[in-house]
Design a protein with these regions (language model features):
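A detector of single, family-specific signature residues
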Residues: 1-402
Length: 402
């Protein structure tokens, strides 16, 4: 007898439901603790019902330890988007209720009745998984750096604005070194042009400002009015934030170097870095989300939808609306639009598409998405054919430069 399974993921416990394919009757329903014993017990229970290859499991997320365990055991894993699950709940509960057991059954029944609409998960290679871990980890650290940098700037603005204004980026190595050395206005009271020059030389300052200009920035900022005790206390906080940011910036730089090395060694990485102004980090961000499984995107329209660079059309009768696509891979959209924005400074074809979009009244983000949609066609073709980008073979590029 054929079965279909549904697994409602949870951080501490998963809900599992197995139903008969023909009748939809529940064959088994049970919770699974998210630990080694629970996952091992799940595999034993599933094996008693049917061979792994004959028992597909539907789940809302395409990754995680439980997904890896199911794939390793030989079960076909079918990811179903949470929006699809949410839209399907009224089919099963008119009152709009929700439970883990109910969602597990819903997933299993969706797989039973609409399984032909969903694509089976095909895992990426280990190299792509490693790249994805590096890229996403770096992105998380960059986001944390921004939070801490804003916190440090706000703290300095509250009692010593000059220290936040002297260098352009508060999270640059020289700016962090400055606030560690001079965390309060009193500590910089005797700071003169000669000391600034020595500080610049010590930290290999490569900016365009002279020592006198930097000192003028420091002195022209509004004076802080904090008392001595308050200034000393906030100075300690400045040192603490600067120390954390310094370590964070160092780790981000090391991860960046590792990612740039990794993307250069991957065949698909060499394809993506061949595009104009893609850059190694941007190319790595695209490849981390794109993966190396060609069957995942059999058509370029599917990749465009996944990347969120094509709009959604709502049409009913005489009414028709085209709106922004919210449901997509936001990481992939950010990476592809970043590449598209950079490419217009190097590719005449890309610049022409962008300028024509601006001429139609599109704002900058909209024009960049239009350009990204055009690039997706080219990127998808090169990725599918496993060939590097060649502007001499790009017909659109040849026409725009003729």
């Amino acid at each position: 007898m054929a079965y279909c399974g549904g697994l409602d993921w949870g951080s501490a416990e998963h809900g599992v439901c197995i139903i008969e394919h023909d009748s939809g009757k529940v064959a088994a329903q049970f919770p699974v603790p998210h630990d080694a014993a629970g996952i091992a017990d799940l595999m034993r229970r599933l094996a008693r019902l049917a061979p792994p290859a004959d028992l597909p499991i539907a789940i809302e997320r395409p990754s995680g330890l439980i997904v890896d365990a199911l794939v390793a055991a030989g079960h076909p894993v079918v990811p179903i988007h949470p929006n699809v699950v949410k839209a399907s709940r009224p089919r099963y509960r008119a009152a709009g209720g929700k439970s883990d057991r109910g969602d597990a059954y819903l997933l299993a029944d969706l797989l039973r009745t609409d399984g032909h609409r969903f694509r089976r998960l095909v895992p990426c290679s280990d190299e792509i998984k490693a790249l994805r871990a590096l890229v996403r980890g770096r992105d998380a650290l960059v986001a944390q750096r921004l939070v801490l940098a804003n916190q440090l700037r706000a703290l300095l603005d509250s009692f010593w604005p000059g220290a936040a204004a002297i260098f352009a980026d508060i999270d640059s190595p020289i700016a962090l070194a400055f606030v560690r050395r001079y965390p309060t206005p009193d500590s910089a009271a005797r700071l003169a042009e000669k000391r600034i020059k020595a500080f610049m030389a010590q930290h290999s300052y490569c900016g365009r400002r002279t020592a006198s200009e930097l000192l003028a920035r420091l002195r022209s900022a509004p004076p802080g009015l904090a008392g001595d005790s308050e200034a000393d206390a906030k100075g300690e906080l400045v040192r603490a934030l600067a120390a954390i940011l310094t370590a964070l910036v160092t780790q981000i730089a090391e991860l960046t170097s590792r990612i740039e090395h990794t993307i250069g060694e991957l065949p698909d990485g060499q394809i993506l870095t061949s595009f104009p102004r893609a850059g190694r980090i941007c190319a790595a961000q695209i490849l981390a989300e794109l993966g190396d499984v060609r069957e995942r995107f059999p058509a370029e329209d599917q990749l465009a939808a996944e990347a969120g660079v094509c709009p959604v059309t709502h049409q009913s009768g005489k009414r028709r609306g085209v709106v922004f696509r919210w449901a997509c891979n936001h990481r992939l959209r950010a990476a592809i639009t970043c590449f598209a924005d950079n490419s217009r400074h190097s590719s005449p074809w890309a610049a022409d598409i962008y300028q024509r979009a601006k001429g139609r009244g599109c704002d900058h983000p909209h024009a960049v998405r239009i350009l990204a949609r055009a690039w997706v066609r080219v990127l998808w073709r090169a990725w599918q054919d496993r060939t590097r980008y060649d502007p001499t073979r790009h017909r659109g590029s040849r026409v725009s430069t003729a």
